[in-house]
Every structure is written in structure tokens, then in C-alpha cells.
Amino acid sequence: MKTVSVAAKLSVLLVLVFVGLAGVAISAPVTVKGYVLDSACAFTKGLDKPISRECATSCANAGSQLVILAEDGTIYWPIAGATPSSGQNPKLLPFAGQKVMASGTLYKRGGSTAIVIDKIEAQTAANK
């Protein structure tokens, strides 16, 4: 019968730990500056900013989720910080079509980026 060295057992354990952690979302505090627009336009139209406030509001009222399109092109999906979860459109709708500054907790997993918004405000000359 072969014996397995302690180093080999430890190596297997470390691999299992890292594989297990790969599925865990990474979170960190963040402040994001960008435009609030509907998710369909963010993906399908290649926009840098919303066409208009009315367009973003109309799509949101029809059920499209609002997102924040950051200055660097990252799309942030607003999510609730508790479960059962709720949609975040009511929080974003007053800012539809506007440039905002949002702060909260960032989550990244599987190539997606989300934010639990603690504070959101329209970006003005004073807070740029």
C-alpha cells in the first residue's frame, strides 16, 4: 500500500479550497460615476449615455431593468442587499437618463458586476 505524503495531502486541500472560493462573489466598497439607462439599450445600442430621460423612463416603466453605465464602460447591475430581493428600478427611476454618482457595495462574479446602492445622487458640477 502506498502512503501519501503530507505535502501531497496539503496540496490537494489547497486546490480544493481555491476551487471552492472561485464561486464566491467578491465584494468591496465602491463609488461609481455614470449614466442611468435601461439594460437593453446598454447592451444592444452600444451607447455611451442614454438617448434621453424619456427613453430610459419609458423602457423602465415597461419592465426593463435600469443599470448604471460607468465612465469606463462597465455596466453595474443594481441589486438589493437583502433577501427576499426586490427590484431596484424604484430607487433609480428618479435618475433615469441622468449622470449619477452612486456609492455602495460592489459584487463581482462570473464576469458580472453588481452594486448594492447605499447612496445615489445626480452628478452636478459641485460633485464631479
Task: Identify the function of each model-found stretch.
Residues 23-128:
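OB-fold and OB-like single-stranded nucleic-acid-recognition modules
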Residues 1-7:
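N-terminal secretory signal peptides that target proteins for export/translocation
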Residues 9-22:
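Bacterial N-terminal signal peptides
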